[in-house]
Amino acid sequence: MPAIAIVGAQWGDEGKGKATDLLGGRVDYVVKPNGGNNAGHTVVVNGEKFELKLLPAGILSPNAVPVIGNGVVVNLEALFEEIDGLESRGHSCEHLKISANAHLVAPYHQTMDKVTERFLGQRAIGTTGRGIGPTYMDKVARLGIRVQDIFDESILRQKIEGALRQKNELLVKLYNRRAVTVDEIAEYFLGYADRLRPMVVDSVNLLNDALDEGKVVLMEGGQATYLDVDHGTYPFVTSSNPTAGGAAVGAGIGPTRFSRTIGIVKAYTTRVGAGPFPTELFDEMGEQLRTTGGEFGVNTGRPRRTGWYDAVMAHYAARINGFTDYFLTKLDVLTGIEKIPVCVAYEVDGVRHDRMPMTQTEFHHAKPVYELFDGWTEDISGARAFTDLPLNAQHYVEALEKLSGCRISAIGVGPGRDQVVQVRDLIQD
């Protein structure tokens, strides 16, 4: 059975955890291929809310093996806090597997992240301050520390020493902070070695063997398309590639092994942090979407910026990722709105653009061109078939499907794991 990828189509917080949880009972492996504990997702099981960051949502599916892939950057302190939190609520994490090649977030990465943001002032990106960007920087600069390194103290110390030559120069001379010692960082990592060891695997062979055996492997992407370092709203992006191509790299699975690539997209749009946002709302309607949709960061509690659905972005995301299906989430949040605007094009300096502008400068100046759709007042939280939805809700979904260039195969109508309208099967056609 080929692999399946789940990818955010906007700026994150689209409901990827809900999609993973929906499919979790039917897959054998759930893989987190990228990111770190900088992005969270919420899953509701039997009315109980779980907020996950490093752990894949598949950790809550007893029949699926959760895997943290080689493309993830792992904060060990945060990882074990999350594990302990789940286990205290009766959910075992003994089946968790972690790639030996995943990179580790060191305490100095978090320090660098925070002081750099302060140093940038008004030009700050708006990171979570959890050290994700600096960890990826070290990975690319070949100064990183990987999971496998903490099981050999001599190698670990050599790598820490190499990294600190650069870090201490910056911390002391540029940021006026104290120097970090090899001993304190080594002690930090070694303190987790014994507990971590049973979880560590060769994830590439594990997952490819599973595919060879006909197992279903689900990639649960973090962040989203427009936070991708190559395809997102640069420089207001993350440090990895949370697109479908990045999922393949972050799990060590070849692109030809994917049968479905599912884009997760909200029925409206949200964003956290700085950066352009053409459909952003600054009025009472923006606050209504934020309040009704519970649009506050899982990690930071920061209120999310809110706006209308952007079909231009959705169409471009479908192209970048090669989406086979869209999973439309939070349609219920729009209930009660008389007229629902959808962005169908942009106007930049008086010129209409039906596609994404080529440059970020143009996108930053883009003004949305809206088409209005009639809303509905009926409660849709109990809908389970497409025909259960009010006609105006059906028309809205059909319009988004046409404008976004990708079929909508599932629709979220509430926070519960079962509050989904499945138009077609997401694993098998």
Swiss-Prot record:
Signal peptide: none annotated. Mg(2+) binds at D13, G40. GO terms for cellular component: cytoplasm. Its main location: cytoplasm. It catalyses: IMP + L-aspartate + GTP = N(6)-(1,2-dicarboxyethyl)-AMP + GDP + phosphate + 2 H(+). GTP binds at residues 12-18, 40-42, 304, 330-332, 412-414. The keyword Metal-binding applies. One of its GO terms (biological process) is 'de novo' AMP biosynthetic process. It is found in: Cytoplasm. One of its GO terms (molecular function) is magnesium ion binding. Pathway: Purine metabolism; AMP biosynthesis via de novo pathway; AMP from IMP: step 1/2. PROSITE patterns: ADENYLOSUCCIN_SYN_1, ADENYLOSUCCIN_SYN_2. Its cofactor is Mg(2+). InterPro entries: Adenylosuccin_syn_GTP-bd, Adenylosuccin_syn_Lys_AS, Adenylosuccinate_synth_dom1, Adenylosuccinate_synth_dom2, Adenylosuccinate_synth_dom3, Adenylosuccinate_synthetase, P-loop_NTPase. Plays an important role in the de novo pathway of purine nucleotide biosynthesis. Catalyzes the first committed step in the biosynthesis of AMP from IMP. Belongs to the adenylosuccinate synthetase family. Homodimer. This is Adenylosuccinate synthetase. It comes from Micrococcus luteus (strain ATCC 4698 / DSM 20030 / JCM 1464 / CCM 169 / CCUG 5858 / IAM 1056 / NBRC 3333 / NCIMB 9278 / NCTC 2665 / VKM Ac-2230).
